[in-house]
C-alpha cells in the first residue's frame, strides 16, 4: 500500500509538472549547427507558402517574417510542385541557394484534407529503399508521388553545381516524407544531409537502421512536448531514425546551443521528447519560427477543424 501511494504521488507530480521532462540531460551543439538548424527550419516553413510552389525560377518569399534567412539568400527555385491530382497532395520545391552553397529540397507539412488522410494511413508497407525495409503507407506514397519529379531536378542541379551540398528538409508531414527522399537520393550516390522538424515515426526498425547509418548526416529535431514525434505508436511497429536533437525550451523562446539534448537511439523512452507525459500541439507549431504562418484562411480552417480528433491525427 505504501509503495502504491508513493507511485501515485510521483505520477501526480509528473502530470502536474509543465516545466521539465522526466529525464533532464544536456549536450550542447555548436554554433554552426544551430545556425544551420535555423536556416533549415525556415526552408521547411517556406514550403507552406503558396507562392513557393506555383512560380518556379523565382526567389523564395514568405511575406510573413518567418523565413528572413531564406529571403536574404541569393536563391531561386528550379522546381515547384503541388500534386493536387494525387491522393496525397504532396507539395514542395527544389531550390539553389548560392549564398549557402546548397541545393535545397523542401516538403510541405499537412495543410489539406488529403494530407491529413495520408497521415492516417497507418499500415506498414514494403519499400524499395532497402531490403526488408517497411514504411508508413501514407508517408511513403507521398514520396512516390513526388519522386519522379524531384529526383531528376536534384540530379540536374548537382550536375550544374557539383560543389554545392544537398539538403532535404521538412516539418510535420514534410518531415515524414524527407527521410525517404534523402535515403533514395543517397542510394543514387549523392551526399545528402537530412533535417526534419517535428517528424512522426516513419517506418520499422530495418528502415530506421538503414537511414540512420547512411552517410550525409541525419538531424531529427524535436521540440519540448510536441505530440507528433510520439506517433505512430511503438506498439504498431514504428521507430524513429537516430539521433534525436531535442530542443529543451518552451514555445517562442530564444534557442541557444545549450538548449539541445542529442540522444542516440530509435526508441528513446523517457528521454528527450518522449519523456513528456503531457503534450501540447503548440510545441509542434514552433521550431525556431512559426511553421504554419503561410497557410491561407481556408486551409487553416480545415486543419483547425481536424485538430479536435485524437492526437494521432494532429500532424
Regions found by a protein language model. Give the residues of each.
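Cleavable N-terminal signal peptides of Sec/SRP-targeted secreted and luminal proteins
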Residues: 2-19
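Serine hydrolase/lipase
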Residues: 5, 20-31, 101, 112, ...
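Flexible, membrane-associating and regulatory peripheral segments of lipid-active enzymes
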Residues: 17-113, 304-313
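Alpha-helical interaction elements in eukaryotic regulators
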Residues: 36-39, 150, 177, 181
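Disulfide-bonded cysteines in secreted/extracellular proteins and peptides
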Residues: 49, 62, 67, 130-133, ...
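A conserved cap/lid and substrate-binding interface adjacent to the catalytic center
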Residues: 69-169, 186-192, 215-216
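Eukaryotic intrinsically disordered and solvent-exposed regulatory patches
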Residues: 89-92, 181, 205
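Gly/Ala-rich beta-loop-alpha elbow adjacent to hydrolase catalytic centers
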Residues: 170-174, 178
